[in-house]
Amino acid sequence: MTDADNLPRHRSSRPPLPDALGKLCTEGKATAQYLWQVPDDQAARAKIVTILNQIAVEAQKQNRKEMGRDVTELLTAAKASPSPQQVDLLVGGFDRLIKLWQAAKSGL
């Protein structure tokens, strides 16, 4: 028996393949990050609201209640007047959504 046989087997560190919910979360984060460059871009803000509404629908289909709560908070932030704090809140919120999605997909 070698030392390699005695080592615990670890899960793969690769992120799960994105489904519709994962793609929406990733797209939302990218759009929110874009707001650092152009904070007053109304089209990007409207896109974020649309993405958040789609995430809410997908999360409900998958019974992901914790994601629904985050989406509600992010919708409020997305509709607020543009500011660096708002962009930071949106980017951080999409990060949380991505982590919640990854945890659900990995079985945690």
Question: Language-model segments: which ranges?
Answer:
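Amphipathic, coiled-coil-like alpha-helical segments
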Residues: 2-35, 58, 62-65, 81-108
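Extended, amphipathic alpha-helices with heptad-repeat/coiled-coil or helix-bundle character
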Residues: 42-81
